[in-house]
From Swiss-Prot:
Pfam families per UniProt: Glycos_transf_2, Ricin_B_lectin
The gene coding this protein: Galnt14
Lumenal membrane side: 27-550
Similarity comment: family membership: Belongs to the glycosyltransferase 2 family. GalNAc-T subfamily.
Example GO molecular function: carbohydrate binding
Organism per entry: Mus musculus
Protein name: Polypeptide N-acetylgalactosaminyltransferase 14
């Protein structure tokens, strides 16, 4: 009997031990959620979403600011408000990704991100559609929060009412701060380990966030952007953009989209591969929060809007990071032809201040080409940059020459950066810009004898780009035919209507081979006040001009 007991003891003990282990394993499974990369937060069902949205009275929110029949639908927001309000906030958009994007697999443990959206007097329909597209097309476990920063809009309720929506928080500035300082405020309270900046008139596309977060998780020094599709400002149709584009710029620090070169396209074996970009558009990107803080966040002394994308792009590349456009991430954006809001110091002055700060801190000796392209920036105040210069020094950043050689070798360095600046005289009179009925016109006026606003309207700059500039405006012909008026138009590099050369005493328009003339009737009288182009004739005094340095 004792032998039998001894024989059975070991098996019984083993069974009991296994039973205990099973009990604790099952109990633990009931009490704990498994941790690690296998965790998946289920997306709410359609019914759950309906319950969440029932707490928010969408119709009441939109109707409070609805377009009224008889009003100009473009007046308030510089896009078709009537059409925007006609479209559902929950509309479907076409999947514009390459078909191979749907085959890609991303990390299962991507970190949740803080989505920061700043706005000033945004249309409620576009703001709501931006948020709803994010909630509809983003796994909920990847959204830490959606931080709205209301930059002192006229109606605080534009933002306040939206906190009823899932994940949404609302901050309001007590005075107008502009894009940079508003984004900084959102970033400072963000709880996510990554920051996702969006504009307030966007619609994100399918699986837009995962490829962005995946690249940042692989390398925290990457700053990544989606391909930006177009939402038509008139019809609000969602239009696919070309995927093989990158951001570029000229020496005036004007952003421009550019096609990849044939060589760059040939090296792309996979259409889903990230695209290195010298600069980002600045409205939509993802960055690691700790990296953002380490790099110095934004230059908070930049005002309202414009130029901040150059500053952060130069800083990222020159201080150890990189910029990428991710083809499998798509976000639609309403591109407007003008700003619907007011710049306290004027659009041009604000942009020059911001880009001048960028040039002075980051462009080293190459800033001379910025001033050659924007000669009137030399006189503009730009604030104190000591903190930003110290930041660059402490980060041990590369030179701008390194940036040109390694990041953007396609940007040609001009052979000459000299500027000829002064009055354009014809005998005792000077070429002058005058405002009439909200338009800038040209005429000959007595030359100003003292400095002041009157004198400034008679100062012109000849640049290496072969443009004749005053502030942000250039001399431009209306047509290429004799007798065509010469007007002031926004400068655009490479525009043949704005290219001139000084030949002896004449100022010749390059494309038409016509000369700047004040005698619109060709009779050499003193009565011709309109500035035109006519066939060049050395004997005509109305085509004789002297450039007198101011």
């Amino acid at each position: 009997m004792r032998r039998l007991t001894r024989r059975l003891a070991l098996p019984i003990f083993g069974v009991l031990w296994i039973t205990v282990l099973l009990f604790f394993w099952v109990t633990k499974r009931k009490l704990e959620v498994p941790l690690g990369p296998e965790v998946q937060t289920p997306k709410p069902s359609d019914a759950d979403w309906d319950d969440l949205w029932e707490q928010f009275d969408e119709r009441r929110y939109l109707n409070a600011k609805k377009w009224r029949v008889g009003d100009d639908p473009y007046k308030l927001y510089a896009f078709n408000q009537r059409e925007s309000e006609r479209i559902s906030s929950n509309r479907a958009v076409p999947d514009t990704r390459h078909k191979r994007c749907s085959l890609l697999v991303y990390c299962t443990d991507l970190p949740p991100t803080s989505i920061i959206i700043t706005f000033h007097n945004e249309a409620r329909s576009t703001l709501l559609r931006t948020i709803r597209s994010v909630l509809n097309r983003t796994p909920m476990h990847l959204i830490q929060e959606i931080i709205l920063v209301d930059d002192f809009s006229n109606d605080p309720e534009d933002c306040k009412q939206l906190i009823k929506l899932p994940k949404v928080k609302c901050l309001r500035n007590n005075e107008r701060q502009g894009l940079v300082r508003s984004r900084m405020r959102g970033a400072d309270i963000a709880q996510g380990t990554t920051l996702t900046f969006l504009d307030s008139h966007c619609e994100v596309n399918r699986d837009w966030l995962q490829p962005l977060l995946h690249r940042v998780k692989e390398d925290y020094t990457r700053v990544v952007c989606p391909v930006i599709d177009i939402i038509n400002l008139d019809t609000f149709n969602y239009i696919e953009s070309a995927s093989e584009l990158r951001g570029g710029f000229d020496w005036s620090l004007h952003f421009q989209w550019e096609q990849l070169s044939l060589e760059q396209k040939a090296l792309r074996l996979d259409p889903t591969e990230p695209i290195r970009t010298p600069i980002i558009a600045g409205g939509l990107f993802v960055i690691d929060k700790a990296w953002f803080d380490y790099l110095g966040k934004y230059d908070v002394d930049m005002d309202i809007w414009g130029g901040e994308n150059f500053e952060i792009s130069f800083r990222v590349w020159m201080c150890g990071g990189g910029l990428e456009i991710i083809p499998c991430s798509r976000v639609g954006h309403v591109f407007r032809k003008k700003h619907p809001y007011v710049f306290p110091d004027g659009n041009a002055n604000t942009y020059i201040k911001n880009t001048k700060r960028t040039a002075e801190v980051w462009m080293d000796e190459y800033k001379q080409y910025y001033y050659a392209a924007r000669p009137f920036a030399l006189e503009r105040p730009f604030g104190n940059i000591e903190n930003r210069l110290n930041l660059r020094k402490n980060l041990h950043c590369q030179t701008f020459k390194w940036n040109l050689e390694n990041v953007y070798p396609e940007l040609r360095v001009p052979p000459d950066s000299s500027i000829q600046k002064g009055n354009i005289r014809q005998r005792q009179k000077c070429l002058e810009s005058q405002k009439q009925k909200k338009q800038e016109i040209l005429r000959l006026s007595p030359c100003a004898k003292v400095k002041g606003d009157g004198a400034k309207s008679q100062v012109w700059a000849f640049t290496y780009t072969q443009q004749i500039i005053q502030e942000e405006l250039c001399l431009s012909v209306v047509t290429l035919f004799p007798g065509a008026p010469v007007v002031l138009a926004l400068c655009k590099n490479g525009d043949e209507r704005q290219l001139w050369t000084k030949t002896g005493a004449r100022i010749e328009h390059i494309a038409s081979h016509l000369c700047l003339d004040t005698d619109m009737f060709g009779d050499s009288t003193e009565d011709g006040k309109e500035v035109v182009v006519n066939p060049c004739e050395s004997s005509l005094m109305s085509q004789h001009w002297d450039i007198v340095s101011s």
